[in-house]
């Protein structure tokens, strides 16, 4: 699958140019729309008929700032592991193949949340998330009320849980720019840091993991602050079903990217790539 053809390649191999009518009998499917109902609203349909050029999707991610601040001090790693994110740390930084992700999006069906491949249907499962990243897939869901708070209120919460209050310019509504978290890590952890300071540093790393990697969005550089209160008690953070939240984010990102009008995609795409590459 890593070297698979996209639909624009299929047109080329068949000698069909973008401005050439599709030969009779050649149909992109589906023939029956009882289940597969997206029709013309799917990226694959638009590429097949030459309505879009089939350019690669822009893969948005913002986790480099996190990996640039590794290895992480052992005293901080202990709390990250306690929160259930040790497997993500062990996976390390991985490049994302934009062509592979784009080809997979062309084969993704929002109606069934599966990839339609020549060999049949396939998808990413909770078991994949658990095995590859060690994220918890049982327990309470990652949900909550997105309560509006002023910048001053969020600043006080950041001071308590992260050990610093970001400048006003780093806030974007109820989101925080990831750059300020990475800059906070530029100052090394003192050798005599207290237990509370180690916990605060661990929360900074976890927010970078969530906003830049596991639950990233197309902003490419912001994390919703609604995650921060969930990180207050690191002993209970690992009980949440972060694996379910991660998989739901991936599904939503794939469904959104099938829209022909979309040019970018975000989410835990490294997971998708790792799962897909063995299928060749």
State each model region's role.
Residues 274-280:
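Cationic, amphipathic, low-complexity alpha-helical segments enriched
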Residues 257-265:
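Acidic, serine/threonine- and proline-rich low-complexity regulatory regions
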Residues 135-138, 256, 277:
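Short, well-ordered loop/turn and helix-capping segments at boundaries between secondary-structure elements
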Residues 129, 255-258:
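Hydrophobic/basic alpha-helical segments enriched in Actinobacteria
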Residues 215-219, 259, 280:
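Flexible helix-coil junctions and inter-repeat linker/turn elements that act as hinges
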Residues 1-251, 267:
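N-terminal leader regions that mediate targeting or early regulatory function
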């Amino acid at each position: 699958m890593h070297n698979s053809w996209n639909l624009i390649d299929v047109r080329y191999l068949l000698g069909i140019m973008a401005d050439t009518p599709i030969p009779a009998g050649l149909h992109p499917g589906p023939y029956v729309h009882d289940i597969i109902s997206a029709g013309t609203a799917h990226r694959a349909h638009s590429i097949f008929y030459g309505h879009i050029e089939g350019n690669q999707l822009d893969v948005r991610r913002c986790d480099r700032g996190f990996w640039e601040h590794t290895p992480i001090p052992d005293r901080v790693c202990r709390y990250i592991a306690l929160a259930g994110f040790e497997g993500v740390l062990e996976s390390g930084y991985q490049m994302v193949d934009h062509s592979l992700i784009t080809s997979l999006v062309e084969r993704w069906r929002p109606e069934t949340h599966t990839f339609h491949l020549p060999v049949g249907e396939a998808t990413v499962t909770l078991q994949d998330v658990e095995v590859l990243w060690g994220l918890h897939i049982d327990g309470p869901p990652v949900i909550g009320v997105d309560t509006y708070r002023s910048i001053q209120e969020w600043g006080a919460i950041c001071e308590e849980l992260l050990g610093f209050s970001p400048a006003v310019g780093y806030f974007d509504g109820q989101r925080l720019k990831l750059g300020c978290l990475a800059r906070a890590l530029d100052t090394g952890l003192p050798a005599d840091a207290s237990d509370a300071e180690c916990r605060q540093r661990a929360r900074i790393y976890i927010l970078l993991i969530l906003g830049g990697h596991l639950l990233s969005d197309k902003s490419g550089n912001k994390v919703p602050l609604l995650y921060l209160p969930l990180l207050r008690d690191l002993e209970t953070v690992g009980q949440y079903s972060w694996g379910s939240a991660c998989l739901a984010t991936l599904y939503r990102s794939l469904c959104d990217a099938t829209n022909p009008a979309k040019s970018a995609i975000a989410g835990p795409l490294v997971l998708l790539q790792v799962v897909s590459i063995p299928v060749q």
